[in-house]
Amino acid sequence: MSIADQIFINTCRDILDNGISDEDLPVRPHWLDGTPAHTIKKFCIVNRYDLSKEFPIITLRRTAFKSAIDEILWIWQKKSNNVHDLNSHIWDSWADETGSIGKAYGYQLGVKSVYPEGEFDQVDRVLYDLKNNPSSRRILTNIYNFQDLHEMHLYPCAYSMTFNVTGNKLNGILNQRSQDTLTANNWNVVQYAVLLHMFAQVSGLEVGEFVHVISDAHIYDRHVPIVEEILQNPQYPAPTFKMNKDVKNFYDFTVDDFELENYQYTKLEKKIEVAI
């Protein structure tokens, strides 16, 4: 079995067995048919993944590896807030007629600020510090910009990354205010694991730990039977992660620079609804 599978199982079981239901409360999320989307939730789930030991993709069901990378490049590399720059339709529900999701996600990472060393956006500041100030305890990003929330079509869920170099290893902490565990948990883990691999490579570092902190980890009511089924699926060894070692500039990475070898998983036959 993979470590990622065991972490996912433990997280889901903790939510289902020890979580609190909001079925008696008014809620904002709803299903496409207009029915309120209630959840079972746990406060503050913290999971740790040692990226030097295995790539943290689950085998209990398929995580769309290439699509996950495409989205993280859309946010962190393209710094885009337009779904027309994304090769999937997962953001369409939050886009306006022009394709914009407002001043959210990639838009915030692209906003420039002035520092003693010059003007940088958030991504370029991280890249600069990893190469020039690796011992800094100030290497982080935050896209939860209060003054722009009214112009965001969706408030950021995964909103802050803190990077820390220990020895020659790059570690990262992802802070997430809210997470739909079935649809997004391993998706986000895969994305930010890949991001750490990219940043480490272009900075001359090795990958270390990825720590995922989720304030409100929840499972939606219509997802519970699917989660219970997935947790009974067979578990396979973690696949081998491959990345193009010739890429030295973060902005040169493409989806084609990443591969998984021997990725085994159980196919999920049921369609997963997404609450909006």
Each predicted region: which residue ranges?
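Terminal, non-catalytic protein-protein interaction segments that mediate quaternary/complex assembly
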Residues: M1-I276
